Each structure stands twice: as C-alpha cells, then as structure tokens.
Amino acid sequence: MEPERLKFGGPRELCGAADLISQFKLVQHHEFFCKKSLPVSLSDSHYLHNVVGDTEIRKGEGMQLDQLIESISQSRETNIRIQPFDIDELQESFQLNDMTPVELPPAEKGAPTIPSKSKSESKDRDRKHKKHKDRDKDKDREHKKHKHKHKDRSKDKDKDKDRDRKKDKNGHHDSGDHSKKHHDKKRKHDGDEDLNDVQRHKKNKHKSSKLDEVGAIRVAG
C-alpha cells in the first residue's frame, strides 16, 4: 500500500499544501536563505518593518540606505561620474569591414517577402470598403422602397380598375332596368291612350245616335 506521505504529490504541511521544498530537495537552500538570521543592519531598517511587520524587528527612524550597503565607505571614496563613450575606442572594439555583397544561388533564396502595408493604408482601405458597403445598403434600401411603392401603386390601380368594372357593370344593369321601366311605362301610357280613344269613340257614337233620334222625333212632329 502506498504510504501517506507519497500520496497526492508527496508529504503535506499542516495547511494541506504539498511540501514542495522536501519534494524537490530544496531543504539546504531554504535553510541557507530563509532560516538564516538577518544581519543587524537589515533588521534595524525601517523598510523591513513596513513590509514584514513588528516580528523581531526593532523600530527605526526611517529607511537608511547605508544599512543595506556593506561597503558604503568604499563607494563614497570612489569618484562616480558619467562619461560619454569614446568613438575611437568603440571603433577599435567593433571593427566594421567593408565586404562585397553576397550573391546566393536561386535554390538557396527564400520566397520574396511582400512588404506589409502600413496601418494607415489598411485603415483607409477598411474605411473605403465600409463606405461602399453602406452605399450598397442604401441603394438596396431605396430599391426595395421603390419596388414596394410600385407594388402598392399597381395594387391601387388594380383596385381602381375593379371598382370601375363593377361600376360599369352596375351602370349597364341600371340602364337596362331603366329602359325596361321606360318601355313598360310607355306601353302603359299607350294602353291608356287606346282605352281613352275607345271610350271617346263610344261617347261620340252614343251622342250621334241620340242626335239622330231627336231629329227623327222632330220630323215626325
């Protein structure tokens, strides 16, 4: 059975994390760098007090750089100044020889590199492409709108034609009815006139017969 310390990547600490120091054999380095007591010059610095805390560090009056530098006396004695580079020394250090241009055979030459376009050119191209795209969209929108209007206009024309056709049909039907009514009225009027003529003829005949009778009586008397 596998021992507990070798499970899950090796032995674990109290917090549950793996003991990487023992696993990677860093105990000696850990003892040398981490467990070694700090020098007095470092432990007295106010910088460590601000970073680490009050643990075994006496409070200082502020961070002092001379406590962190052991050879501060030597650094003060040396004359520190910035000097510019000497061109002659640089030329002696880096000798540049003029050489003839190297001609490679075609087999060893690589593919020619196409110079990449600058960002401004690519932006201009993208902007132009976007403008053309927007213009095409506007054209398509106008075309659709015009097509829709033309379709609505044709629908209205068809509706007007159907309305006129129905109107003409109704007008023709009404004219037929009107002519029929007029014809019936005329026939009725003609019939009434004929009836009046017959009655008038009868009255005249009856009147003439009466006159004949009166004349005959007068002659006889």
Curated annotation (Swiss-Prot):
Residues 142-152, 179-188 have a biased composition (Basic residues). Transmembrane segments: none annotated. Residues 153-178 have a biased composition (Basic and acidic residues). Belongs to the plant Mediator complex subunit 19 family. The gene is MED19A. Disulfide bonds: none annotated. GO terms for cellular component: mediator complex. GO terms for biological process: regulation of transcription by RNA polymerase II. Keywords: Nucleus, Transcription, Transcription regulation. InterPro entries: Mediator_Med19_met (IPR019403). Component of the Mediator complex, a coactivator involved in the regulated transcription of nearly all RNA polymerase II-dependent genes. Mediator functions as a bridge to convey information from gene-specific regulatory proteins to the basal RNA polymerase II transcription machinery. The Mediator complex, having a compact conformation in its free form, is recruited to promoters by direct interactions with regulatory proteins and serves for the assembly of a functional preinitiation complex with RNA polymerase II and the general transcription factors. Its main location: nucleus. It is found in: Nucleus. This is Mediator of RNA polymerase II transcription subunit 19a. Residues 101-221 are annotated as: Disordered. Coiled coil: none annotated. GO terms for molecular function: transcription coregulator activity. Component of the Mediator complex. Interacts with FIB2.
